[in-house]
Amino acid sequence: MSKVASIVDVLQGKVAIGETVTVRGWVRTRRDSKAGLSFLAVYDGSCFDPIQAIINNDIKNYESEILRLTTGCSVIVTGKVVESPSEGQAVELQAEKVEVTGFVEDPDTYPMAAKRHSIEYLREVAHLRPRTNIIGAVSRVRHCLSQAIHRFFHEQGFYWVATPLITASDTEGAGEMFRVSTLDLENLPRSENGKVDFSQDFFGKESFLTVSGQLNGETYACALSKIYTFGPTFRAENSNTTRHLAEFWMVEPEVAFATLADNAKLAEDMLKYVFRAVLAERKDDLQFFEKHVDKDVITRLENFVNSDFAQIDYTDAIDVLLKSGKKFEFPVSWGIDLSSEHERFLAEEYFKSPVVVKNYPKDIKAFYMRLNDDGKTVAAMDVLAPGIGEIIGGSQREERLEVLDKRMEEMGLNPDDYWWYRDLRKYGSVPHSGFGLGFERLIVYVTGVQNIRDVIPFPRAPRNANF
């Protein structure tokens, strides 16, 4: 009985020439020659390239099944690994046996027929789009990046903490949250003042899907010193753009005794680590993106890992923008939140490198960010990358209880809702810092794929929760 091997192992020479092997996968294409041969391109998702299987017409099911194979059919091919005479592939399979495990019922109506499909069309058949070159490549890159993130933090002595998806706290204070409830919408219980009585709900209070694992992460950082979260987060933001999702994944490290400078260094080290990993491990997929999606993909990543990060205070960045002579769609003045055009000007035109903008006005940042001595700014930072703008947002956290309480009061937040978060400042409080990285935005940057809905398996967005 021949051994079963993944196609990537066969193509990378891990199976010896002359050895008989079995590969299992799906037909990408079939072509027939007048010499009584058929050539099957078979892929199994283990790498970008399919393997070519050469099938002689003396195979017993050649007429009955092989000549009926079309794109998408599933097959198990057993054959001898031989050197390929044609360009582009070092080896191919000389088939000895081909078992068809599944035909495509109607090739004429198969949504993934062998032709080029628009990325917009593929979103309508999200259950089948992993079979395409582009989504297959995105999926392998996504896996590579996630593994590299876990590896980086593990090597740096961090612990991964699973923070809850259901919460009663609003980390961002923005109120754009999905409510979680088991109450009967047709017969809602009401209190005396006519408001919904959430005390009768499943959790006994108003509850939501989390917008961030940060607050929970801080509790563990104040015990384990270095932790990170990596999981799904949710925003009920009614934004139908190429940059927004209602459900997305966040990477959120949190470090006790860390300053804003430590935070910026951690962000730089992490990004460079994961970019080096994807350049080394997913060269085949990146070459596809370079050829068909964004010609600058590989160059951009190589430049990133070889660049020193620039740093600039928000106030100085505003001066740079005002003196640039450039007409921006959104006017520049001290106190604004930088828009994407401002961020990209700084990273792409002014610094021509990744840049950390730090010390933002307190009024545009969250309540938990540490108030600076000037009383006007907080120890916040954004990492801006050429080609996309903001890729990471973070801060040193406010460790002084009285200052935290004052900030919450200014923002109209009820301290009682955050009693456990305030406890961290009562019992052995320490300076600590952390940041958030939108994982899908990272994948957009790495692949050059323009719409964030194409880098997550099943995108969730306004009026879109199919599949």
From Swiss-Prot:
Compartment(s): Cytoplasm
PROSITE patterns: AA_TRNA_LIGASE_II
Coiled-coil segments on the chain, per record: none
Reactions catalysed, as given in the entry: tRNA(Asn) + L-asparagine + ATP = L-asparaginyl-tRNA(Asn) + AMP + diphosphate + H(+)
Domain of life: Bacteria
Enzyme class: ligase
Record key words, sorted: Aminoacyl-tRNA synthetase, ATP-binding, Cytoplasm, Ligase, Nucleotide-binding, Protein biosynthesis
GO cellular component: cytoplasm
This enzyme's EC code(s): 6.1.1.22
Entry keyword annotation includes Nuclease: no
Cited Pfam families: tRNA-synt_2 (PF00152), tRNA_anti-codon (PF01336)
Swiss-Prot/TrEMBL GO biological process terms: asparaginyl-tRNA aminoacylation
GO molecular function, one term: ATP binding
Protein family membership: Belongs to the class-II aminoacyl-tRNA synthetase family.
Subunit structure comment from the entry: Homodimer.
Identification of the protein by name: Asparagine--tRNA ligase
